[in-house]
Amino acid sequence: MIKRFAQCLREYKWTALVSPVCMIGEVAMEVTIPLVMADLYDYGIAVGNMTVVWQKALQLLICAIVSLMFGVMSANYASKAATGFARNLRHDMYYRVQDFSFSNIDKFSSASIVTRLTSDVANIQMAFQMMIRMAIRCPMMLILAMVSSMRISPKLSTVYFIAIPILAAVLLGIVPLVFKIFDRVFKTYDRLNTVVQENVHGIRVVKSFVREDKEVSKFKTISGSIYDDFCKAEHILALNAPVMQICVYACILTISWVGAKMVVASGNNAALGLTTGELSSMFTYTTQILSSLMMLSMVFVMVIMSQAPLRRCYEILQEEPNLTSPENAVEEVPDGSIDFENVSFRYSRKAKRPALQDVNLHIPSGATVGILGSTGSSKSTLVQLIPRLYDVTEGSVKVGGIDVKDYDLEVLRDNVAMVLQKNTLFSGSIKENLRWGNANATDEELIHACKLACADEFITSFPDGYDTHIEQGGSNVSGGQKQRLCIARALLKKPKILILDDSTSAVDTHTDAMIRKAFKEEIPGTTKLIIAQRISSIQDSNIIIVMENGQVACVGDHETLMKNSDFYRGIYESQQKGSED
């Protein structure tokens, strides 16, 4: 894990190394200052030697300035390294998510991915920034201050060997308790993000069903759970401070009592025992030693807090995409013919029954294919295997006579355009959204595609036309308008295969008929697969596939199915009766 995260330093590697080096310089100066202070008192103030006073005062000033410079440099480099590390980590995770297949994404909820890319990375950044400074400062301060105090008085320094184990024992007792709590906190954050995202995306539904109070209550419950867990963690961590203070005060009192007796006994003579200046230095070293332990405990706490985010981010980085392009991949799709050969598919190995079973189909290039079936009959699953959004569990899917697994993924998906059930538009102008289909499309091509999708009429009715701004998720256009924009975007790809997954359900029958007519006249060479609930949307198709319980129930054109399929005929008659009513 450490090796993988270290790769995120990249161009900030040297910056991350310079910060601890500067910190060593700062600590060295801080440890030197008490020694200079002792000499200032013992050899200057105590004996009235102003030359020594001025010399030591100048040394103190130099030490303070150098310490300040090193401290500022260390903080600056640490900030740059931590910010750069977080940026690279976030980029690596985001790029990895872009390579995920649908089955990879199914392992993580969208809310969990958002949390990992935002708050988890922010927590890791703070921990990293503290570590590259304090993880060096604390041990260095502890060691140098201990050595300096041992040189002054080994007898007084023994008090540290009592205080340090006590603090270490408290810390070791706190760590496992707090780790469990913080691990639970970050999982709860995922639930909180899920609630927020669902509420924001479905705000119209929430308001139409007057569920505001219910949503507020749900949010309050989860938020309260996070609050309770944080309070538990803080209560446990709070034990660290009083234990630390007790140890500090106990050490200072012990050194004051024993040290004062040593100063009096020696007559303030260093050769015979201890001087007043050395005793004052011992007080400073006591504070430095125990405060370094306190800071070290804070580092441990921060490391504990970052363990859960580190593990969660590592899961993203280590998740291998299930779908990759093979070596020597096919770089060209010959035509739009499609073959399903003994295809079975399960969304997971644990699934009790397959979503698709024993599917055998041949669709010639340029054909118009209608797909019909009840809810849950795996119509969408069937077409998602064509651009290899999932891999089949058994059998094979072929496009242009070649197994989809043999294609370069980009090449295959560039030649297959899908308009999904859930239409997605992005914030930006209509032009920017359309150019997702073809970044280099001219304005004339945009207009032509929109005319085929019957979208040009309503676009030109907007004051800004094709420059009209689309809100996030397309919230400022109707469902039918959104569908037509998505169809136009797909047409701009000029694909060999066009898949419409119930993509005209929100448009009226007249517009639906106009779109189908435009497809027939303008893109006759493109294989068109149309999933629909209305038979009127697909009855003029060359082939109609009826799905039932993940299997192909029957195949044929409209006339054939009306004669041979009771299921198809029943749907047709019920829809005809409904339209008459």
Model features per residue range: what roles?
Residues M1-E30, M37, I45-L60, V66, ...:
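Membrane-integrated ABC transporters
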Residues E11, T15-A28, D39, C63, ...:
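Transmembrane helices of ABC transporter permease
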Residues E11-K13, Y77, D99-S103, S119-I132, ...:
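An intracellular "coupling" helix at the cytosolic face of ABC transporter transmembrane type-1 domains
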Residues W14-A16, C63-A82, R133-M140, F161-T188, ...:
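Alpha-helical transmembrane segments of multi-pass membrane proteins
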Residues V47-G48, T83, H91-T115, S119-V121, ...:
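Short intracellular "coupling" helices and adjacent cytoplasmic loop segments at the cytosolic face
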Residues N49-Q55, S148-I162, K232-R312, I316-L317:
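Helix-loop-helix
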Residues E332-D581:
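ABC-type nucleotide-binding domain
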